[in-house]
Amino acid sequence: APHTTVIFVHGGGYVQGINPTHLLFLHRFARQCGVSVLVPDYDPAPYGTAADAFRRITGLYTTLREKHPEEKVVLMGDSAGAGMIFGLAIDWATQGIQAPEGIIAISPWVDATLSNPEIDAYVERDPMLDVNRLHVDAHAWAGAWNVSDPRISPIRADLSVLKNSDVTVLVGTDEIFYPDVVDFAQRLTTAGVRTKLHIGEKMIHDYPLLPIPEAQEPMNRIEMAMIEA
């Protein structure tokens, strides 16, 4: 079987660098799944913008494809980073760049406008994410782009361009992104994209990354997605 390389784009609301939780998760993940992991270092806002990160990660991806054409490449990310991998894959499809074999998104932020009225019902349940803070961060990150640009808010894109990738999405019921993620997964399926949605009942944002027993089941699902990509 061809070797798999994972490009992991970390979250942090577009304003934070990689943190120890990410690194510990990636250590467990690489060991369980037996894959190589590349973690692009992008400059968060206000030092960098979406356009900068897209340039950097696209360069890494195209170089990897040229040097190792035989490898499977899976894009993976959490939170803001999981929103970004969809934006990147959509952008690559429109540019005619080869699609990643798999996309694995953990608690993805798929609509930077956060305009879905259903979000209000989840604010009390979510101990991690703050809507007002995310609004500010999204505008800083967008730079010259609009926050509703499909590269930043992939829920607004023509998702049929992702048909060449297998998509796996994981989300908890106790996070403000939950209604958007469920809607997004439905839109992917409707657009003809092979999509698996895994819902963590009573789980919080980014729960598969946390060092808790409940993270083992999603890790196994991620491993299966790797094998099937």
List PLM regions with ranges:
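Alpha/beta-hydrolase superfamily serine-hydrolase fold, recognizing
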Residues: 1-229
